[in-house]
Amino acid sequence: MFGYVVANIEDATDEEKARYHAAYCGLCRTLGRRCGQRCRLALNYDMTFLVLLLESLYEPPTITSKARCMAHPLTQHDYTCSETTDYAADVTVALAYHKCLDDWNDDRSVAARVGAAALSSAYRRVRTRLPRQCGAIERELAAIGQLERARREGAADEAANAFGHLMAELFVREEDLWSNTLRAVGFHLGRFIYLMDAVCDLKRDAKRGSYNPLAGLECLPQDMEVALSVIAGNAVAEFEKLPLEQDLHLLRNVLYSGIWQKYNAQFKADEKEGAASAAESVEEAASAAESTGENAGENTNAAESTRETRA
């Protein structure tokens, strides 16, 4: 389920692109230093969003430097690291380890089994550091696995809720004033990721005869767009409650546009038109959530700002 919570690079400024890649490179270096070089293979942009979000909220001391690496041996690249990067590296390892286990259990993939074995010692260390978060991963993935093995129709919402609860715990590094809001952002974003993954895989799973939680609903992938927009709107409404300044436009880029890129690429004839439509749908859903008092965001004009930047 990696690859959904990413920035729409086409709509980012040069400064934002540099910041995004510096955070990504910092996460890569931290994975190698903290968890072992093989763990750098688990690197993904989804956790870069978590780094940017928590750094914007808590503003920890940050190290900024340049370095070469195996991927870029000839040119030095900027990177940034903080205690938030350490946390995101641990979460990355935990998710990657359990993804390998899941792939092995589902497909008997030899590569997944090798990956799980390679990450096992690092995961044991991470579990010692993050018992609450790793416990949530184990508990909620077990619940999802049970639902998927039962192949019961109508279980998509239950499974999405379970993944939402998983993500909710990962968004909270420590309990404080903002824990409930961060959990709410993670919960709605987790629901979105699970259902978006099911939508994008629906046709492929049907061809393979693989289980898909949406298979029994007899709906086209495009029929899920409204539901996905509502869920994304809920995540946005909670996100806008956070007192963020640093990287705010870049974070909004991810939530208003970036999370729709795979959907737009697969189901929209014109991806740019689709991205604008999706952002408008998310804005409407966030406004609706605020007006009903369910998710009263404090900055519901974020999508307008994002669209003005596009223009």
Regions found by a protein language model. Name each.
Residues M1-A184, R191, L195-A227, A237-L250, ...:
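Acidic catalytic motifs of isoprenoid enzymes
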Residues S277, S281, S287, S291, ...:
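Ser/Thr/Pro-rich low-complexity tandem-repeat tracts
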